[in-house]
Amino acid sequence: MSNNYQKEIQTKLTKGLLDMIVLQLIGHQSMHGYQIITKIRKTFGIYFGPSTVYPFLANLEKKGYINSEWNLTAEKPRKIFTITAAGKTMLKFTEDSLGLICRTMHSVENAAAATSTVEIAPVAH
Protein backbone atom coordinates (compact mmCIF):
# COMPACT_ATOMS: atom_id res chain seq x y z
CA MET A 1 0.00 0.00 0.00
CA SER A 2 1.46 3.36 -1.00
CA ASN A 3 2.10 6.16 1.48
CA ASN A 4 -0.31 8.41 -0.43
CA TYR A 5 -3.09 5.86 -0.10
CA GLN A 6 -2.34 5.36 3.60
CA LYS A 7 -2.48 9.12 4.17
CA GLU A 8 -5.75 9.33 2.22
CA ILE A 9 -7.32 6.61 4.38
CA GLN A 10 -6.06 8.23 7.60
CA THR A 11 -7.45 11.60 6.50
CA LYS A 12 -10.86 10.11 5.65
CA LEU A 13 -11.05 8.27 8.98
CA THR A 14 -9.96 11.34 10.93
CA LYS A 15 -12.49 13.53 9.13
CA GLY A 16 -15.19 10.95 9.79
CA LEU A 17 -14.34 11.09 13.49
CA LEU A 18 -13.90 14.86 13.62
CA ASP A 19 -16.94 15.36 15.86
CA MET A 20 -15.50 12.91 18.38
CA ILE A 21 -12.01 14.39 18.11
CA VAL A 22 -13.26 17.94 18.69
CA LEU A 23 -15.40 16.87 21.66
CA GLN A 24 -12.43 14.99 23.11
CA LEU A 25 -10.11 17.99 22.74
CA ILE A 26 -12.43 20.57 24.26
CA GLY A 27 -13.54 18.06 26.88
CA HIS A 28 -10.04 18.31 28.32
CA GLN A 29 -9.65 22.06 27.88
CA SER A 30 -11.79 24.89 26.52
CA MET A 31 -10.27 26.11 23.26
CA HIS A 32 -10.81 28.58 20.46
CA GLY A 33 -11.06 27.44 16.86
CA TYR A 34 -7.45 28.04 15.88
CA GLN A 35 -6.26 26.05 18.92
CA ILE A 36 -8.47 23.16 17.83
CA ILE A 37 -7.10 23.28 14.28
CA THR A 38 -3.52 23.38 15.58
CA LYS A 39 -4.07 20.55 18.08
CA ILE A 40 -5.58 18.31 15.40
CA ARG A 41 -2.63 18.96 13.10
CA LYS A 42 -0.07 18.29 15.84
CA THR A 43 -1.85 15.19 17.14
CA PHE A 44 -2.87 13.53 13.88
CA GLY A 45 -0.50 15.10 11.35
CA ILE A 46 -3.49 16.17 9.27
CA TYR A 47 -4.49 19.74 8.52
CA PHE A 48 -8.17 20.63 8.51
CA GLY A 49 -8.57 24.32 7.83
CA PRO A 50 -11.13 26.77 9.15
CA SER A 51 -13.54 25.96 6.31
CA THR A 52 -13.73 22.39 7.65
CA VAL A 53 -13.46 22.89 11.41
CA TYR A 54 -15.75 25.89 11.94
CA PRO A 55 -18.80 24.24 10.33
CA PHE A 56 -18.20 21.21 12.58
CA LEU A 57 -18.09 23.53 15.59
CA ALA A 58 -21.28 25.30 14.50
CA ASN A 59 -23.03 21.96 14.03
CA LEU A 60 -21.89 20.67 17.44
CA GLU A 61 -23.12 23.89 19.05
CA LYS A 62 -26.46 23.70 17.22
CA LYS A 63 -26.92 20.15 18.54
CA GLY A 64 -26.14 21.31 22.08
CA TYR A 65 -22.89 19.34 22.45
CA ILE A 66 -20.74 22.43 22.91
CA ASN A 67 -21.19 26.03 24.01
CA SER A 68 -19.25 29.06 22.89
CA GLU A 69 -18.49 32.36 24.52
CA TRP A 70 -16.53 35.33 23.26
CA ASN A 71 -13.36 36.13 25.17
CA LEU A 72 -12.94 39.86 24.64
CA THR A 73 -10.16 40.31 27.20
CA ALA A 74 -7.52 38.63 25.06
CA GLU A 75 -5.34 40.55 22.64
CA LYS A 76 -7.61 39.36 19.85
CA PRO A 77 -11.27 38.49 20.52
CA ARG A 78 -11.69 34.73 20.41
CA LYS A 79 -14.72 32.47 20.53
CA ILE A 80 -14.00 29.88 23.23
CA PHE A 81 -15.68 26.48 22.97
CA THR A 82 -16.55 24.24 25.92
CA ILE A 83 -18.19 20.82 26.05
CA THR A 84 -21.67 20.44 27.55
CA ALA A 85 -23.10 17.54 29.55
CA ALA A 86 -24.86 16.38 26.36
CA GLY A 87 -21.51 16.59 24.55
CA LYS A 88 -19.86 14.41 27.20
CA THR A 89 -22.66 11.87 26.84
CA MET A 90 -22.32 11.90 23.04
CA LEU A 91 -18.54 11.54 23.28
CA LYS A 92 -18.88 8.50 25.56
CA PHE A 93 -21.45 6.95 23.22
CA THR A 94 -19.23 7.59 20.18
CA GLU A 95 -16.15 6.15 21.91
CA ASP A 96 -18.12 3.06 22.95
CA SER A 97 -19.49 2.65 19.41
CA LEU A 98 -16.03 2.96 17.89
CA GLY A 99 -14.71 0.39 20.36
CA LEU A 100 -17.50 -2.01 19.41
CA ILE A 101 -16.76 -1.55 15.71
CA CYS A 102 -13.04 -2.23 16.27
CA ARG A 103 -13.75 -5.32 18.41
CA THR A 104 -16.17 -6.64 15.79
CA MET A 105 -13.62 -6.12 13.02
CA HIS A 106 -10.98 -7.97 15.05
CA SER A 107 -13.32 -10.88 15.76
CA VAL A 108 -14.19 -11.14 12.06
CA GLU A 109 -10.49 -11.00 11.19
CA ASN A 110 -9.64 -13.63 13.81
CA ALA A 111 -12.47 -15.89 12.63
CA ALA A 112 -11.32 -15.55 9.03
CA ALA A 113 -7.73 -16.29 10.03
CA ALA A 114 -8.82 -19.35 12.01
CA THR A 115 -10.79 -20.80 9.12
CA SER A 116 -8.11 -20.08 6.57
CA THR A 117 -5.39 -21.84 8.56
CA VAL A 118 -7.32 -25.02 9.27
CA GLU A 119 -5.79 -27.84 7.31
CA ILE A 120 -7.85 -30.84 6.45
CA ALA A 121 -5.93 -34.07 6.33
CA PRO A 122 -6.33 -36.02 3.12
CA VAL A 123 -8.48 -39.10 3.39
CA ALA A 124 -6.51 -42.33 2.92
CA HIS A 125 -7.99 -44.76 0.37
Give residue ranges: language-model regions.
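N-terminal helix-turn-helix DNA-binding core of bacterial DNA-binding proteins
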Residues: 10-54
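Basic, amphipathic "hinge/linker" alpha-helix immediately C-terminal to the N-terminal HTH DNA-binding motif
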Residues: 77-95
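Short, contiguous hydrophobic alpha-helices characteristic of membrane insertion segments
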Residues: 11, 65, 115-116
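Generic recognition of well-ordered alpha-helical segments
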Residues: 38, 85, 100-103
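Amphipathic alpha-helical dimerization/coiled-coil segments
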Residues: 92-125
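Short, hydrophobic-biased segments on the C-terminal half of alpha helices
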Residues: 54-61
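Beta-hairpin "wing" of winged helix-turn-helix
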Residues: 63-77, 82
